[in-house]
């Protein structure tokens, strides 16, 4: 996954517990020892990443993990980021990891990400457990696919995070025409 995200993009995607990181020493270490990773996949670990030399389009397309692994999980399913020439155009807030319960809770909410909220509700629910917020009710990705052609990119995905309360499936479809940039 390091080759898929960090080495392919060379930027920090602020999905699910990630924040700005400095991997320069680690990258130098890998180069010094001759490690080279190549990842041609567009879909890995619950993320779809489409990119060319100028633009990167990434979307969180993963279902919620098991609750015991969710202390840093954010309810940002189907959120996306766009990077152009190394600069973020659309980004998520990242995750606030320090000891401020209010900021932890806000950064876990769907509202803190480039995704849908309905009637001030996040797609997932969290509960407090041993001074940490963990997942109470998660979501499942019900469909996902992508198209990556020279002149046309598309990511389509849907989840059931609003099904029980609002009887609604959230589907997001992003189309991009790289040659029009």
Where are each of the predicted segments found?
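Carbohydrate-active enzyme catalytic cores, enriched for enzymes
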Residues: 1-91, 95
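Alpha-helix initiation/capping motif
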Residues: 22, 94, 121, 177-178
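Residues embedded in well-ordered secondary-structure elements
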Residues: 39, 69-71, 75, 105, ...
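Extended, loop-rich substrate-binding clefts of extracytoplasmic carbohydrate-active enzymes
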Residues: 43-56, 122, 126-179
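Catalytic core of carbohydrate-active enzymes
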Residues: 55-144
